[in-house]
């Protein structure tokens, strides 16, 4: 990596959150404007301390092949929604390609990987063998709390507009595994196996 300092943005999360929280109409120009301004804002806010922006993007997940219930409630919610989610995702994907082709940001989009996988891998890569490089994660996803075990990894939540902190990230990760994750459709360890 040429510049190990990085601001890693959870692209799909910021794009979808913008559409949903702003109650945006499905307008390509408006969604593009929102996504680009959001990225620009975080670049300006954190670049001095954390360097280059890296945009981590979702692809279809290998997890659904292993566990079909993974995020099934989200799919069901979208099906019941009046919003044209196919069009929203088409626009988000198109803007991702435009950013990759025309902007100075690094865009990482890996087949069968979610942004979570990319972010976790990048963080571990920057922390291995005593590198301990500063990393800022832009995401409201609490799954990233487990990465806070590295002292120089910070997380900023666009939803709450504040830093995400936890006094014991290792304990949080253990509890998260044991309790499951209802938002992702992952059962706790006591649930019957399918």
Feature-to-residue mapping (PLM):
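Extended two-metal-dependent nuclease catalytic cores across DNA- and RNA-processing enzymes
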Residues: 2-3, 49-50, 76-194
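Domain-level signal for Mg2+-assisted phosphodiester chemistry and nucleotide/NA-binding surfaces
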Residues: 1-98
